[in-house]
């Protein structure tokens, strides 16, 4: 079996996004590399190297294999 990890992004990093992040981290084939949420005032990186953005356009510039959309239903 391949050791390749799928690079994952999360759009919407509130309660649901953070919960999804926890579940994704528990899977050996996936790795969260970037997240975005309007609550972030600027772009940067967390201590573990995961990048964060305040807008989804920057997130989409990442070379992702999958994107989890964790936005409220009304959006």
What does each model-found stretch correspond to?
Residues 1-47:
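N-terminal Rossmann-like dinucleotide-binding module
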Residues 50-75:
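Beta-loop-alpha module in the N-terminal Rossmann-like domain of NAD(P)-dependent dehydrogenases
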């Amino acid at each position: 079996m391949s050791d390749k990890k799928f690079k994952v992004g999360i759009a919407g990093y509130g309660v649901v996004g953070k919960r999804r992040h926890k579940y994704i981290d528990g899977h050996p084939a996936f790795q969260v590399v970037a997240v975005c949420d309007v609550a972030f005032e600027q772009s940067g990186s967390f201590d573990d190297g995961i990048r964060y953005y305040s807008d989804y356009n920057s997130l989409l510039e990442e070379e992702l294999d999958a994107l989890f959309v964790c936005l409220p239903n009304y959006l």
